[in-house]
Curated annotation (Swiss-Prot):
Protein name (Swiss-Prot/TrEMBL): Palmitoyltransferase ZDHHC9
Residues the record marks as active site: 169 (s-palmitoyl cysteine intermediate)
Disulfide links within the chain: none
Gene Ontology CC entries for this record: cytosol; endoplasmic reticulum; endoplasmic reticulum membrane; endoplasmic reticulum-Golgi intermediate compartment membrane; Golgi apparatus; Golgi membrane; palmitoyltransferase complex
Stretches assigned to the Cytoplasmic side: 1-35, 85-183, 250-364
Key word 4Fe-4S present: no
Gene name tied to this protein: ZDHHC9
Record key words, sorted: Acyltransferase, Disease variant, Endoplasmic reticulum, Golgi apparatus, Host-virus interaction, Intellectual disability, Lipoprotein, Membrane, Palmitate, Transferase, Transmembrane, Transmembrane helix
Tissue expression as described in the entry: Highly expressed in kidney, skeletal muscle, brain, lung and liver. Absent in thymus, spleen and leukocytes.
Function per UniProt: Palmitoyltransferase that catalyzes the addition of palmitate onto various protein substrates, such as ADRB2, GSDMD, HRAS, NRAS and CGAS. The ZDHHC9-GOLGA7 complex is a palmitoyltransferase specific for HRAS and NRAS. May have a palmitoyltransferase activity toward the beta-2 adrenergic receptor/ADRB2 and therefore regulate G protein-coupled receptor signaling. Acts as a regulator of innate immunity by catalyzing palmitoylation of CGAS, thereby promoting CGAS homodimerization and cyclic GMP-AMP synthase activity.
Gene Ontology terms: biological process: MAPK cascade; peptidyl-L-cysteine S-palmitoylation; positive regulation by host of viral process; positive regulation of cGAS/STING signaling pathway; positive regulation of pyroptotic inflammatory response; protein palmitoylation; protein targeting to membrane
KW Cell inner membrane (keyword) present: no
Gene Ontology molecular functions: palmitoyltransferase activity; protein-cysteine S-palmitoyltransferase activity; Ras palmitoyltransferase activity
Amino acid sequence: MSVMVVRKKVTRKWEKLPGRNTFCCDGRVMMARQKGIFYLTLFLILGTCTLFFAFECRYLAVQLSPAIPVFAAMLFLFSMATLLRTSFSDPGVIPRALPDEAAFIEMEIEATNGAVPQGQRPPPRIKNFQINNQIVKLKYCYTCKIFRPPRASHCSICDNCVERFDHHCPWVGNCVGKRNYRYFYLFILSLSLLTIYVFAFNIVYVALKSLKIGFLETLKETPGTVLEVLICFFTLWSVVGLTGFHTFLVALNQTTNEDIKGSWTGKNRVQNPYSHGNIVKNCCEVLCGPLPPSVLDRRGILPLEESGSRPPSTQETSSSLLPQSPAPTEHLNSNEMPEDSSTPEEMPPPEPPEPPQEAAEAEK
């Protein structure tokens, strides 16, 4: 007897996650919805490096050293790896509260603040938390229905609370937070070195060619080199400046969001409770500390009730799994009767027994 197995589509948690993120590769890749500038970043890096490897590297490897394209390839691969790691990873999104958790938090807030008279503004929903003998305020997020952890903030573009939120970077197409900040820093650092490297050797290439055929003839014969020089010149200042700014933040163990708001350098002159007072310790904590795991569980499987589908009943399941074919027959002995008799059309009724001979003679 053949049995047909019916498989239903599994609903994973990333398909039902709130927010404005997009997912690819069955939830393994997580990005923001606005990815146009990210594609521009890829185009500029890939286009500039392709021209550099196709023209300048071939000439410089023969005239100067074959190590020039090797080192350029190492910088290029490292920059691309850190860019994709920053763009495709979870920056540290904090899950929103479930309905039961949100109701419990609301009851806790009402019990703490008391009843608010009608017409008056309710007090701010803030909890005080002490870190290194410093009072830190935990703010309530009305979208996620949670009290945000220290240094967390709600991104208005991705519509999620991100742990140790630094900023939303459209150039990488993702938020920069606790789980991908180190990769973001390594990306802009390696990109700065790559830009300086390509720009410098383009100048060397033009100088060497100008010694043979002249400066104007070199510019006419190598329009790709001119394009590379222009791209590197205009992007060099912004990338190198951004790297220097984030190096300053890493040394202080501070985020871009805290620097913009003036959390530790404002009028109140409150000391940064997260700084160790040592540049080396701060750099080790930000860039070399253990990477926390993602708390989203994007590829987890949702129950049928939460995925929006109705669980099949027992009768539906049995009828869908069993084949619609007649039951197998068994071989019976001549003196055995089957438990389930056939229909009247298939089995004729038995003939009445003949009366015995003695009863017939008595009647006569």
